Amino acid sequence: MTEHNVRNFNINFGPQHPAAHGVLRLVLELDGEIVERVDPHIGLLHRGTEKLIETKTYLQAVPYFDRLDYVAPMNQEHAYALAVERLLGIEIPIRGQLIRVLYSEIGRILSHLLNVTTQAMDVGALTPPLWGFEEREKLMVFYERASGSRMHAAYIRPGGVHQDLPEKLVQDIGDWCDPFLKALDDIDNLLTGNRIFKQRNVDIGVVSLEDCWAWGFSGVMVRGSGAAWDLRRAQPYECYSDLEFDIPIGKNGDNYDRYLIRMIEMRQSVRIMKQCVNRLLSDAKTGPFSSIDGKVVPPKRGEMKRSMEALIHHFKLYTEGYHVPAGEVYAAVEAPKGEFGVYLVSDGSNKPYRCKIRAPGYAHLQAMDFMCRGHQLADVAAVLGSLDIVFGEVDR
């Protein structure tokens, strides 16, 4: 009887794998079908964003944030704008805050819709993505009507938002809400009670709450394990403290709980959007949508035609940019994927001295090995989908 040396089998997952959500390369060590080790290789989409921001003025840095988590672009701009505003010490008028919150929640729905439906596709359900993309298309049109661009909006800027929303657009967003909930019910009916979907997700990728904190998780990952931690509640920014919404939490910390939380969060986002729309059409119908500080926010076209002072301000803002007082600040928002933070250091000039970006997906991806060990090879795609990783923000 000859002895056989049994050794583990190494395979590459990606970087052009349909379930890899971008340019992820995982080196998997398998013992038969069982995953022994997962090695994520990142950096294939590295563009040097943080370094590039150091060479741009504070306004020119805004578009870089759209290109991080490109599924929900405005949520990143929001964090950056908050950081700059804290350094400048300026307040945003209530209409501007409501517009920002409205579009942040649209971004949350954009992200969750894509994640829930593509994760379903990864485990074999082919209908939800088609239904989800139909709704996302309508939201992309709202992005386009506000900023002129479907994805890279550069709409939320330090000092407020780029331009005011027409009343018709606000009404259309309000009209979109209820039909969307019906479409969400359809997706819900297809997946939530589906036997195959549950077999692929229940008790897969379980993380305890202690492990969540140890790995630096945030957002849905933490809430799926039972902590009601949401920055919109825990550290309210903008006008979230005046809005009513619930925070769903899971109790098993598995893929299925995270899926359920994303489904409920979309309904809560619609609830927030309805409140914003009502206020934008009633008490906040008129009024400034961005700060009235002429040194930060460009003047109106009409003023520029009449006032030399306004013309000079406009020219200086778009050439040299405004100078931000020296200091450092960390501003975080509850992005769809978790806590998206911007640590901004200013040296008093017109360019950031350092802009550190804290992407939630980066912390989640490093736990891939911890979460997949002992699972089947087929579960790797299910866990990866449940983490909700977009490579723009991981590699930056």
UniProtKB/Swiss-Prot annotation:
Known function: NDH-1 shuttles electrons from NADH, via FMN and iron-sulfur (Fe-S) centers, to quinones in the respiratory chain. The immediate electron acceptor for the enzyme in this species is believed to be ubiquinone. Couples the redox reaction to proton translocation (for every two electrons transferred, four hydrogen ions are translocated across the cytoplasmic membrane), and thus conserves the redox energy in a proton gradient.
SUPFAM superfamilies for this protein: HydB/Nqo4-like (SSF56762)
Native species: Rhizobium etli (strain CIAT 652)
Entry-linked Pfam families: Complex1_49kDa
Protein name: NADH-quinone oxidoreductase subunit D 1
Predominant cellular place of this UniProt entry's protein: membrane
GO MF annotations in UniProt: NAD binding; NADH:ubiquinone reductase (non-electrogenic) activity; quinone binding
UniProt EC number: 7.1.1.-
Top-rank EC class of the record's enzyme: translocase
Assembly with partners or alone: NDH-1 is composed of 14 different subunits. Subunits NuoB, C, D, E, F, and G constitute the peripheral sector of the complex.
This protein's encoding gene: nuoD1
Catalytic activity, as annotated: a quinone + NADH + 5 H(+)(in) = a quinol + NAD(+) + 4 H(+)(out)
